[in-house]
């Protein structure tokens, strides 16, 4: 696959990554609601470039189990360090926020909690249960950590019946030692296989621009197809600060389209691939597209 990408030593942000910030009362109202309930969002904690768009449309991805992580992935803007015990009232407040925002599709993620015996699985399950009670017509998507390969923890989450289980592989395996030193690529693939084996909708994603090449991206897509992944997201890595790894290349939108075509050709039903795509960005649209594909005649 040819890749018409900008990979010069001193990279300038290309025009397709420049985001126009909307001015909206909804943005302020959404942020005030979330903060007023003492909740965190990955949108804010991870400096997501789509935060203004999502908040302005009245959506957010809830970050549970605190905003401090027990791991230190090189690409991530969430602070690593000393964590606090889980807040038992947090699931109720997440459900309240989702109900007050009248969400049709709720996305919940977390920091990685290697300090907890179950990695936070019970807290995820409690949050899913609260959401399904408060918003019975809504779909619930969870973006989970690897739970250190604990199959019982994954079963706890699956028993709460989320509609989508997302776990991101983030980058090709050759780059894990540098980018995700505390994670294991094969362990992540096994988690996704188990989601599918349990009858769930499996979703995963990765970033480009961290030193990988197109062939490696295609290799990840092949692995995710082999796991039975239903939805895959691919987006451009954006350096959160000078303390994070530099962007190695800005991938052209045409190449993102080629990645999507490649993934679909391998049998992945829905591949959402574009520069500003993030794993929870337009998550409702991705899920609806998958449902449409499943109902269309072969």
UniProtKB/Swiss-Prot annotation:
Pfam families assigned to the protein according to its UniProt record, in alphabetical order: Radical_SAM
UniProt keyword annotations, A-Z: 4Fe-4S, Cytoplasm, Iron, Iron-sulfur, Metal-binding, S-adenosyl-L-methionine, Transferase
Residues annotated for [4Fe-4S] cluster 2 binding in this entry: 69, 73, 76
Entry keyword annotation includes Ribonucleoprotein: no
Record-listed E.C. numbers: 2.8.1.8
Subcellular location: Cytoplasm
UniProt cofactor(s): [4Fe-4S] cluster
Listed InterPro entries: Aldolase_TIM, Elp3/MiaA/NifB-like_rSAM, Lipoyl_synth, rSAM
Residue ranges constituting the Radical SAM core domain according to the UniProt record: 55-269
Pathway named in the protein's UniProt entry: Protein modification; protein lipoylation via endogenous pathway; protein N(6)-(lipoyl)lysine from octanoyl-[acyl-carrier-protein]: step 2/2
Chain residues that bind [4Fe-4S] cluster 1: 43, 48, 54, 280
Gene3D superfamilies: Aldolase class I (3.20.20.70)
Catalytic activity: [[Fe-S] cluster scaffold protein carrying a second [4Fe-4S](2+) cluster] + N(6)-octanoyl-L-lysyl-[protein] + 2 oxidized [2Fe-2S]-[ferredoxin] + 2 S-adenosyl-L-methionine + 4 H(+) = [[Fe-S] cluster scaffold protein] + N(6)-[(R)-dihydrolipoyl]-L-lysyl-[protein] + 4 Fe(3+) + 2 hydrogen sulfide + 2 5'-deoxyadenosine + 2 L-methionine + 2 reduced [2Fe-2S]-[ferredoxin]
GO cellular component labels: cytoplasm
Principal cellular location given in the protein's record: cytoplasm
Cofactor note: Binds 2 [4Fe-4S] clusters per subunit. One cluster is coordinated with 3 cysteines and an exchangeable S-adenosyl-L-methionine.
Recorded superkingdom: Bacteria
GO molecular function list: 4 iron, 4 sulfur cluster binding; lipoate synthase activity; metal ion binding
Family statement: Belongs to the radical SAM superfamily. Lipoyl synthase family.
NCBIfam families linked to this entry: lipA (TIGR00510), PRK05481.1 (NF004019), PRK12928.1 (NF009544)
Protein name (record): Lipoyl synthase
Protein source organism: Nitratidesulfovibrio vulgaris (strain ATCC 29579 / DSM 644 / CCUG 34227 / NCIMB 8303 / VKM B-1760 / Hildenborough)
Lineage: Bacteria, Pseudomonadati, Thermodesulfobacteriota, Desulfovibrionia, Desulfovibrionales
């Amino acid at each position: 696959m040819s890749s018409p990408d900008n990979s010069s030593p001193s990279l300038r942000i290309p025009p397709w990554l420049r985001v126009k910030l909307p001015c909206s009362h909804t943005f302020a109202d959404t942020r005030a609601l979330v903060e007023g309930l003492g909740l965190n969002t990955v949108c804010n904690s991870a400096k997501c470039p789509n935060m203004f768009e999502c908040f302005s449309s009245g959506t957010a991805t809830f970050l549970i189990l605190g905003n401090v992580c027990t791991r230190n992935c090189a690409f991530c803007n969430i602070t690593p360090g000393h964590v606090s015990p889980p807040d038992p009232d947090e699931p109720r407040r997440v459900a309240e926020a989702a109900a007050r925002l009248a969400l049709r599709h709720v996305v919940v993620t977390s920091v990685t909690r290697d300090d907890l015996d179950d990695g936070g699985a019970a807290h995820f399950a409690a949050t899913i249960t609260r959401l399904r009670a408060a918003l019975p017509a809504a779909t619930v998507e969870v973006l989970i950590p690897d739970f250190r390969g604990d199959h019982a923890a994954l079963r706890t989450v699956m028993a709460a019946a989320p509609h989508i289980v997302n776990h991101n592989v983030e980058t090709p395996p050759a780059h894990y030692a540098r980018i995700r030193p505390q994670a294991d690529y094969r362990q992540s693939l096994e988690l996704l296989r188990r989601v599918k084996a349990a009858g769930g909708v499996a979703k995963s994603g990765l970033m480009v621009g961290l030193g990988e090449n197109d062939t490696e991206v295609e290799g990840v897509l092949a692995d995710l197809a082999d796991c039975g992944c239903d939805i895959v997201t691919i987006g451009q890595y954006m350096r959160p600060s000078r303390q994070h790894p530099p962007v190695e290349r800005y991938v052209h939108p045409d190449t993102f389209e080629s990645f999507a075509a490649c993934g679909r050709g391998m049998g992945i039903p829905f591949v959402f691939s574009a520069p500003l795509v993030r794993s929870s960005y337009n998550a409702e649209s991705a899920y609806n597209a998958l449902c449409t594909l499943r109902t269309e005649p072969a």
